[in-house]
Amino acid sequence: MLDAAPPIWASRTRTIFAGLFGVVLAALAGVPAAKAAELSSAVAYLYSSVSIYPPSASAMTVCYGFVCRRREILDFSAGDRNALTQIMAAGRASAAAERAAVQKAVVWFDRRMGPILGTNKRVAKADFRYFDDKHNFDCWDTTRNTTSLLLVLQEWGLLKHHAVGDPKYRGNTLVLQTPHNTAVLVDRVTKAEWVVDLWPRGYLQPPDVMPVEKWVKED
């Protein structure tokens, strides 16, 4: 994905400060300090880099328009929470089942926000070359949105087999690999990392879920 934003790991110093800034933002948003402090510097930087609050148990900022140039607040209703709880209940039996449930939860999010944002018109692998930012996510938007949704599911106690991991980056210009980012889940038992990548998929299509080791080799 092509855009002007730096890689997530571009500056170690910046991510350290971003982690502190993310805690401050969360505190101002009313998130308990203990929860805010649990954000890693890499996750906190997703939010501080575009001056938005991390998600709370009741709301999240939804980014679109490429690098979060457009944004909308999703206030979770009782119906939203019930729908996501039912979706995730199907994944309690195993880690693989939970990853499949997460795919359905991301599709739920896509359907929930599509008509509100206009992203029900979005295309797969969108970037600035499509000249339609108002209807699309770039990979920075999908990384932020998916990470936020996963953090909410985690806060609600709906992730039994996984924890939310640090976002991952790929992009090897020597082999013409396009720069790209994604959200990540970490298996609590095996510590294996799994990407949850919505950007390569169109509206209402399930996100890619695969081991990070495989994802970093794709384009």
Whereabouts are the PLM-identified features?
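Sec/Tat signal peptide C-region and signal peptidase I cleavage site
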Residues: 31-36
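Mid-length scaffold segments of soluble, non-membrane domains
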Residues: 98-162
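Active-site-adjacent structural elements in enzyme catalytic domains
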Residues: 42-48, 104-107, 111, 137, ...
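N-terminal secretory signal peptides that target proteins for export/translocation
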Residues: 1-12
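Hydrophobic/aromatic-rich core segments of domains that either
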Residues: 151-215
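Acidic/histidine-rich, surface-exposed loop or edge segments in extracytoplasmic proteins
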Residues: 64-96, 122-132
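Short N-terminal segments immediately surrounding and downstream of signal-peptide cleavage
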Residues: 37-66
